[in-house]
């Protein structure tokens, strides 16, 4: 279970993400240039804020209702304070995200018994796993204009979690040793 210490809470949490390729998936945001991912993130966060009642209450839906495309009449208990509000995330999220999540959840349910359940809430939105702005780097992992700068990990836009950030950081450290 999810807990800040003993991991013995009645609650559990996990993050399921979909890939968004800022160059291919966001043509509507092209006029923002390198900040298009940041603008898209702002729009997603605004959508969640509005759907939650313009407060810190998070919009949510039972997992089965999300996959089936129907509004949840009630939600499961949550450890998130200040709470959840039932919202049609299946139709609120851009189809780029919603359709990918729905098909992914359905596939998980086929492969892991008990995964596709009404006992789970889908809570929106966790709007990023890495930086919405990618700091450029060359084939040697160094910034193309600033010698000695090796953008890496989540902050540089090259990783989406602890393991991938560690792996990218290791690659950048090795590149720095060779390059410096």
Language-model segments: which ranges?
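An anion/pyrophosphate-binding glycine-rich loop and adjacent beta-alpha core
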Residues: 1-88
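Glycine- and aromatic-enriched mobile tails/lids
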Residues: 5, 24-26, 76, 147-148, ...
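Structural signal for hydrophobic packing residues in well-ordered secondary-structure cores
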Residues: 67, 71, 105-116, 173-180
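Short capping/connector residues at structural and topological boundaries
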Residues: 68-72, 127-130, 138-140, 163, ...
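A glycine-rich dinucleotide-binding beta-alpha-beta segment and adjacent secondary-structure elements
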Residues: 84-159
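A conserved FAD-binding loop/helix module that cradles the flavin
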Residues: 153-179
């Amino acid at each position: 279970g999810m807990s800040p210490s003993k991991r013995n809470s009645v609650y559990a949490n996990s993050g399921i993400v979909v890939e968004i390729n800022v160059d291919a998936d966001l043509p509507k945001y092209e006029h923002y240039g390198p900040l298009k991912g940041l603008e898209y993130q702002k729009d997603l966060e605004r959508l969640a804020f509005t759907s939650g009642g313009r407060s810190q209450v998070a919009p949510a839906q039972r997992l089965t209702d999300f996959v089936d495309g129907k509004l949840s009449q009630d939600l499961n208990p949550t450890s998130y304070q200040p709470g959840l509000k039932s919202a049609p995330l299946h139709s609120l999220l851009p189809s780029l995200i919603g359709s990918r999540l729905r098909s992914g959840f359905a596939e998980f349910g086929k492969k892991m018994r008990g995964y596709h359940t009404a006992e789970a809430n889908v809570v929106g939105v966790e709007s990023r796993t890495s930086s919405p702005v990618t700091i450029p780097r060359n084939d040697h992992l160094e910034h193309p204009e600033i010698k000695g700068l090796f953008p890496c990990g989540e902050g540089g836009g090259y990783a989406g979690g602890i393991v991938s950030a560690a792996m990218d950081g290791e690659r950048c450290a090795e590149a720095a040793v060779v390059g410096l």
